C-alpha cells in the first residue's frame, strides 16, 4: 500500500494527487479489479495466451505496415 506523508503547508488536494499517482504506479487498482472475482487457473492461462496472441498479431501488423511504407 503506497504511503504519502503530507508535507508542512501542503494542500490536501496536492497530497491526494500524489497518493493517487503512487497507487497508479504500484498497480493497486488493477490488482483489486483482478482479484475481485476468482478466476480458475485454466481461464487465467487462456486469457494470458489470448493476450499474447493479440500482442503478436499487433506487432506483425505494425511490421507489415512499416514495410509497405518503405516501397
Curated annotation (Swiss-Prot):
Residues 45-71 have a biased composition (Basic residues). The keyword Repeat does not apply. Keywords: Ribonucleoprotein, Ribosomal protein. GO terms for molecular function: structural constituent of ribosome. It comes from the Bacteria. InterPro entries: Ribosomal_bS21 (IPR001911), Ribosomal_bS21_CS (IPR018278), Ribosomal_bS21_sf (IPR038380). Residues 37-71 are annotated as: Disordered. GO terms for cellular component: ribonucleoprotein complex; ribosome. Belongs to the bacterial ribosomal protein bS21 family. This is Small ribosomal subunit protein bS21. The gene is rpsU.
Amino acid at each position: 500500500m503506497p504511503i504519502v506523508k503530507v508535507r508542512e503547508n501542503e494542500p490536501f488536494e496536492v497530497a491526494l494527487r500524489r497518493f493517487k499517482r503512487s497507487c497508479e504506479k504500484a498497480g493497486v487498482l488493477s490488482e483489486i479489479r483482478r482479484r475481485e472475482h476468482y478466476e480458475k487457473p485454466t481461464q487465467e492461462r487462456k486469457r494470458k495466451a489470448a493476450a499474447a496472441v493479440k500482442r503478436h498479431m499487433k506487432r506483425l501488423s505494425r511490421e507489415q505496415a512499416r514495410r509497405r511504407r518503405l516501397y
